[in-house]
Structure formats: structure tokens, C-alpha cells
Amino acid sequence: DLCLGDPDWMPHPVIYMGKAISALEKFLRRRFPDTQKGLLMAGAALAAILPLGSFLMAAAAIYLAGLVHPVLAFLLETLWCWQALAVKGLYTESMRVKKKLEEQDLPGARSAVARIVGRDTQNLDAAGVAKAAIETVAENFSDGVAAPLFYLVIGGAPLGLCYKAINTMDSMVGYKNCLLYTSDAADDTPCVD
């Protein structure tokens, strides 16, 4: 991942997880009452369905690929292990911020850090830009490198993709609403940070 990153032309599991989260959220909102208890139950259902589904689909695909040829199973698992990590993107974006700060290009540094943080960067001074970048790199290293690597080591691509599903739920809807309170809590449980 550090050498190649995630090529734009290659389908990425997180994109499909995101689509599944959006579809499941809509489906579950229609099926559960619009009360705090109903939304928590829907959140619990989503927090169970997506990670378990990601794990089972990956495990089944690798198993079926192995029936065709063991090398095919190895290649598929290798591809998904690669896609579960986010080393190059994190490195590239953080170095862009560093370069702009070294050039004393504060507007450029603000713009660069805005690509990796989820907050307003327009009023940050140089120290604020550096702090935002450091905080984001620390969190994203945990979410994009350390935790996925941990789960890949103990459970291969299926468990690595299960973790990515949990993390993607948290990123998309974990802080947005009551429905995904459970997804936010699920993201905090498997982290190794």
C-alpha cells in the first residue's frame, strides 16, 4: 500500500460498504419506529449486519476462489489485505501539509489540511494547521493502518474487512444521529489505539 496506494481505477471495498450503509440505513429507518429505542435497535441491527456480512462475504469469496485454484484465493486475500490499509494516502496528504507549512504558505497549508480533517480550517494559524494535521494523522494511523493491520494478522482479509466496515459506519453515520450511536460504540470497541 505504501508503494501503490489505492489506484482510482480499482474497485474498493469501502466504496461498496458505504453504499451498503446508506441503503441499510434507509431500509432500517423504515422498519423500526422513529423513537429513541427504535433508532437504537436499528443502529444495533446495522452494527451487526454490515460487519458480519463483510466478514462472511469475504470469507466465502476466498473459500470459493480456493476451490477454483489456491493461487486465486491467495491473490484475492492479498488484494483485500492491501485495500484494508491506508498508508500511502495518509502519508501523501500529511506531507502536503508539511510542505506548505515549510514554504510558509498558510492558505495552501489550510487548504491541504482541509483535505484530511473534518473541521473548518479557514481561520487556523500555522500552529493550528500543524495541530490539526498531527491529530488527524494520529487518528487515521490508528484507523487506517494499526487497527486494520492488527485484524489482518489475527483474521486475514475477512476480519480486516469486518473492521473496515465498522470504521466506515462510524465515519458515515456514527456521529450523525441516534440511529448509529451503536455504530459509533462499535467502532470504539475493536480499535487498538
Predicted features along the sequence, with ranges:
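Divalent-cation-assisted or electrostatically stabilized phosphate/pyrophosphate-binding catalytic cores
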Residues: 11-28, 179-183
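Conserved small/polar residues in nucleotide/adenosyl-binding loops
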Residues: 1, 181-188
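Hydrophobic alpha-helical membrane-embedded segments
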Residues: 2-8, 72-99
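Polar-ligand-bearing catalytic/cofactor-coordination segments
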Residues: 85-142, 146-158, 168-178
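A residue-level signal for conserved active-site and pocket-lining positions in enzyme catalytic cores
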Residues: 1, 24, 109
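Multi-pass membrane catalytic core of lipid/isoprenoid biosynthesis enzymes
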Residues: 26-58, 115, 129-142, 147, ...
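Long, highly hydrophobic alpha-helical transmembrane signal-anchor segments
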Residues: 42-87, 158-161, 165-174, 178-179
